[in-house]
Amino acid sequence: MSDSSTSKAKVLIVEDDDDLRHGLTRRLQNSGYEVVQATDGVAAISVARHERPDVVLLDLGLPAGSGLIVLERYANLPDLSTIPVVVLTGRDPRIAEPATRKFHVAAFLQKPADNKDLVEAIERALRTQTAHGRRPLTPPSEPT
């Protein structure tokens, strides 16, 4: 992503369920975001390093490294530690939250999240990111 104030925010979706991942991708693209994808914990690290997303939408239940392992790796890698994460879980977020408390988690969403909650969580994460000194972003414009 460039540093231009007109740049779209880039979201990395880390979700192993193909249908859900593709549905989330369409919804976010329709809301004006640039989207990249990963299907497991290993890819979540390599894609984040290569693509430099502005926010990560992370499923906690992943093959090849659970979401908690991904959070721990992000926290310990200087080039990834400032990326805000929105956790997406099939469990009650109140149960997932204590396990992730020590990591930088901007928001929790329970599957299936409606589009309004999804976009609000991502925008909140982007505001958090800007407040913590990463490059300023312009939230995507409303779809026409």
Question: What is the meaning of each model-derived region?
Answer:
Residues 15:
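Conserved acidic carboxylate
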Residues 22, 66-69, 92-109, 116, ...:
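Alpha4 helix (beta4-alpha4-beta5 surface) of REC/receiver domains from two-component response regulators
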Residues 32-39, 47:
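Short hydrophobic/Thr-rich beta-strand motif most characteristic of the beta2 strand and flanking loop
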Residues 40-43, 66-72:
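Acidic catalytic/metal-coordinating carboxylates
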Residues 51-57, 62:
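Active-site beta3 strand of CheY-like receiver
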Residues 63, 81, 93:
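The feature encodes the CheY-like receiver
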Residues 113-123, 130, 134:
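C-terminal output helix
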